[in-house]
Amino acid sequence: MIDFTGTSGRHEGNFNAPKAITRAAVLYVFRCLVGADIPLNDGCLKPLRLIIPEGCLLDPAFPAAVVAGNVETSQAITNALFLATGALAASQGTMNNLTFGNARHQYYETICGGAGAGNGFAGASAVQTHMTNSRMTDVEILEKRLPVRIDSFSIREQKDSQSLWPGGAGALRSILFLEDMEMNLLSGHRTIAPPGLAGGQDGAVGRGRIIRADGEEERLDAVEQASLYAGDRLVIETPGGGGYGRP
């Protein structure tokens, strides 16, 4: 039985997850735990009893906004279930949804981060995790099609001396803008770290900032909208995964 009783009520923003998204996240987790190649169909959920309170964050009533429920809340569901079963420490827990554009250009990407560790294995660094289901545009194609330059795309340093099996590190992505654009960021784990498991260290929290052309820096919240001008840089550091066990 998977009982979501006690879940918060409908979110005033757009982090509400339709019931179908909640069911999909549960299905994903338990198919991972089976450890065998089984067909994907409705029968996978038959052995499970789901209790999802009507009207809550995970089954909101119309006209609740739901866009972030698919890309962000679904990640929270998977992390919660893997932690509850003791199978896996938390992964980055967000898709780091980034959109930017102007009258001529529009672009959307999700940015990779750290995966959680488990009993006998470390977490992978700078990978798409769990519900993301997407890849990133090649740098060469992105720079050819849009007036931006990727200054840096690397793995963050994440020191973990507390865990027997360390979590994966997040990524650092720096984008230089050559034209004025509007930017939106929809992300998570900027304040609360992705939890470790069985005494393992928590993953690093994510960070974001704008470095203006004159050198001034502006810190970004997890959910943010901002105007970017030619010469500005956007720097996103994604969360790391939690570690597993004590040495």
What spans do the regions from the language model cover?
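Glycine/proline-enriched, intrinsically flexible loops and inter-domain linkers
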Residues: 1-247
